[in-house]
Amino acid sequence: MAQEIYDIAIIGGGPVGMFAAFYAGLRDTKVILLESLATLGGQVTSLYPEKTILDVAGFSATKGTDFIAALSQQLQRFPVDIRTQTTVVNLEKSGNLFTVTTNNGTFIQAKTVIVATGKGAFEPRKIQVAGVDNLVGQGVHYFIKNKHDFDNHHIAIAGGGDSAVDMATMLSHIAAETTLIHRRDNFRAMEQSVKTLMASKVIRETPKKILSVSKQPDGRLKLRLAHVKDNQQVNDIIVDDLIINYGFISENKTIQAWAVQPKLAGQVFAVNQTLETNVPGLFVIGDASHYIGKADLIAIGLGEAPSAVNAAIRCFDPNRGGPGHSSSMVLKDTIVRND
């Protein structure tokens, strides 16, 4: 039996990869979606399930888990071949076909490939305070799976970016007391998020750093804070939980081992106006791609997905019409024309 050949193989099952797979189904292509984790959703599912997403069109505010659930439901409309716990360990190209080798020992052939892996594997940026790592899971957290684990708790959040600011505001509605610790007086977050923070009941400890974290006899944590310019100017706070949100360190070691190596722009892939790399038929979307003016937002990646899919189709079927509009396609036996 001849090996099955896909029109498009999409590597990465985060929001951008999921939407690309849906749109590929909308264009009636044979598509496979490969995700290394056990579930779809990427960083939104793994790192920010409780975070409120504000910058996606059509959603005034949506929780990360709800957003991924909506994408999953949308994806079920078409027979996309979805394989989770599948890491692409090699990508080769021979003639007009790509061969994808997975950690499961399977070989997948595709006419085109769309990479939507984000910045790659990720791990939290650790706080550089002695002894804190021993307290992870005992009041110190790098991830939040369920915000209600902090109901009526006294909590401290270390960080000053979008995630830390949004988390502090969100948890202030359910925690007994919320303190945000940042090394600067100014926060590196969206302007409206900062305005919301300033109007909230969150206590701001700035410009401060954490000197030490110690476990108290009652199980709570004592945080010794110091002014960033004067270690003698200190104060202590007692909390139930410390959430460290210094961002994440990412790497693409797996991709670096591929036989196919498209041109890089720093640590991500350089693409042209159709999201294609210098390797014909290989496209990159989302945070893994770079072009002049690129912003790393979910909304941007979602917009790139249809462009990459349409360009991929033109690679293996130049005579095919497109790009396609959903309002002129067959959906559940109903045709609507936008004449």
UniProtKB/Swiss-Prot annotation:
Catalyzed reaction equations: 2 reduced [2Fe-2S]-[ferredoxin] + NADP(+) + H(+) = 2 oxidized [2Fe-2S]-[ferredoxin] + NADPH
Query: Which top-rank group of organisms is this from?
Result: Bacteria
Q: Which residues form the signal peptide?
A: none
**Cofactor(s) annotated in UniProt:** FAD
GO molecular function annotation: ferredoxin-NADP+ reductase activity; flavin adenine dinucleotide binding; NADP binding
Comment on bound cofactor: Binds 1 FAD per subunit.
Organism for this UniProt entry: Leuconostoc citreum (strain KM20)
Q: What is this protein called?
A: Ferredoxin--NADP reductase
